[in-house]
């Protein structure tokens, strides 16, 4: 376990929708928002157990470890729950980029589509078939 979370909030006490809760991932030092994803009970438990973020893929209907393919893992430093108990904030140390498009953050574009984020890797080189 990455830190002492006991007593951990019971997942059933969280206000999940269809067993999923939104997780906002933020860089622990810079406070940059890196990504948002969903967690189910298993993903949260695995994250707490390993100290590496795990999420539930709604499209693939399976658990996934962030960085499993790319090596760009997120080392969890702290987990917070919001006042309504319907979302989580994960403060992490990001290794490499968080975005599968090659950027440090998934929020690399503004509303007009202009790239405003830092590209940190080439996806074609990382996600070779």
Curated annotation (Swiss-Prot):
Annotated pathway: Amino-acid biosynthesis; L-histidine biosynthesis; L-histidine from 5-phospho-alpha-D-ribose 1-diphosphate: step 3/9
Keywords of the record, alphabetical order, are: Amino-acid biosynthesis, Cytoplasm, Histidine biosynthesis, Hydrolase, Magnesium, Metal-binding, Zinc
Recorded GO molecular functions are: magnesium ion binding; phosphoribosyl-AMP cyclohydrolase activity; zinc ion binding
Q: Name one Pfam family in it.
A: PRA-CH
What Gene3D superfamilies does the database record attribute to this sequence?
A: 4.10.80.70, Phosphoribosyl-AMP cyclohydrolase
Top-rank taxon of the source lineage equals Archaea
Query: Which residues of the sequence carry a binding annotation for Mg(2+)?
Result: 82, 84, 86
Q: Where in the cell is it found?
A: Cytoplasm
Per its record, the protein catalyses:
1-(5-phospho-beta-D-ribosyl)-5'-AMP + H2O = 1-(5-phospho-beta-D-ribosyl)-5-[(5-phospho-beta-D-ribosylamino)methylideneamino]imidazole-4-carboxamide
Q: How is the cofactor bound here?
A: Binds 1 Mg(2+) ion per subunit. Binds 1 zinc ion per subunit.
Name a biological process GO annotation. Answer: L-histidine biosynthetic process
Spell out the subunit comment: Homodimer.
- Family stated for the protein in its record: Belongs to the PRA-CH family.
Its job: Catalyzes the hydrolysis of the adenine ring of phosphoribosyl-AMP.
The protein, known as = Phosphoribosyl-AMP cyclohydrolase
Q: Which organism is it from?
A: Methanosarcina barkeri (strain Fusaro / DSM 804)
Gene coding for it: hisI
